UniProtKB/Swiss-Prot annotation:
Leader sequence residues: none
Organism: Escherichia coli O1:K1 / APEC
The protein's role, per its UniProt record: Catalyzes the conversion of allantoin (5-ureidohydantoin) to allantoic acid by hydrolytic cleavage of the five-member hydantoin ring.
GO biological process assignments: allantoin catabolic process; purine nucleobase catabolic process
Gene Ontology CC terms: cytoplasm
Protein name: Allantoinase
Reactions that this protein is recorded to catalyse: (S)-allantoin + H2O = allantoate + H(+)
Top EC group: hydrolase
E.C. no: 3.5.2.5
Coiled coil: none
Ligase as UniProt keyword: no
SUPFAM superfamilies: Composite domain of metallo-dependent hydrolases (SSF51338), Metallo-dependent hydrolases (SSF51556)
Subunit architecture: Homotetramer.
Amino acid sequence: MSFDLIIKNGTVILENEARVVDIAVKDGKIAAIGQDLGDAKDVMDASGLVVSPGMVDAHTHISEPGRSHWEGYETGTRAAAKGGITTMIEMPLNQLPATVDRASIELKFDAAKGKLTIDAAQLGGLVSYNIDRLHELDEVGVVGFKCFVATCGDRGIDNDFRDVNDWQFFKGAQKLGELGQPVLVHCENALICDALGEEAKREGRVTAHDYVASRPVFTEVEAIRRVLYLAKVAGCRLHVCHVSSPEGVEEVTRARQEGQDVTCESCPHYFVLDTDQFEEIGTLAKCSPPIRDLENQKGMWEKLFNGEIDCLVSDHSPCPPEMKAGNIMKAWGGIAGLQSCMDVMFDEAVQKRGMSLPMFGKLMATNAADIFGLQQKGRIAPGKDADFVFIQPNSSYVLTNDDLEYRHKVSPYVGRTIGARITKTILRGDVIYDIEQGFPVAPKGQFILKHQQ
């Protein structure tokens, strides 16, 4: 049999092992894995490289339509491809209107036409004003629903995202349980965080350490504990977003051990940045939950290696530079990190701390694909989409602003020495990024809908 592509001699991350083996691709799918696979139109030599499943980033904000001056599909998905991401799951907020019904998600589809370098699945929003319309988004094909129990959204904009109170969360979770959809939650106690933040501003406490102190660990833990119980009573599967503390992870682990259907994610910035670095970097490193101290970071690494965190995500949430101006308490909270997930975590987790390659593959791709039902993604296995990223180990470079593909070329990772490089990203058998050629093909990304899986 003749194939379209054979990748030879790479160390391939399979589900339970990593070994030097060849991969054959036909019609955008993985056709065979082994040795001496035969002929192909194209042969790639991956000697000395790690061949990983393309990253499935389960937490991305693109902001188009309505706020494409923050980030757009063209720039955002190019950055993703350059960073080794082949599939993103897009959040329902930052864009205007927020993705809360059939009409708003159709605007997303229209805005993305001809611009997707990678594939994309969508999340719907669970907000205070759409509980009777959740079925519309389920029918369209979203793979989950995001909500905030922390304060969010611009109250001066009618169609912006909104947080939910406990009653709205419970009613929404009941409906989503009936639909068989997971609910994803940003967990911080809204009343306490808001009050602590206002108190700090009144008293002129506006440093990074002050910001972190205004969103203490207990506000995350309390919110996780609360939504765990409400989701359990409502009969809804729960996914806890961007957990920032080991104590927060422990709540998820405890519930899981008791039989609850719950998963959680975290982000590279909670593992490689700490509060002192946040103070030095400034507003570019502001996010919520916040980047905490070094002791907290050590605890997060322990939880990650223990297998208590299901997947790593970017939570890419950029904004125009002027929204990052001023003191930390006033600046927009969100990190531009889409392009730096795979290489930073390969360096920090695999090269510096000895994480196994199969575990790395699960955290970056496989588990997210499983959690959100992306059946063709996340694995290097026959029949799956031929989505790969080539990683060059022990190849250090310093990230510069010019390296970035974002709408705004800023990131808290600029200036960082990263000890591994993404050299090639392949989507359904086609090279979409190459370190020498750039982006050699026109955007070929597609939307992934739940009912098409």
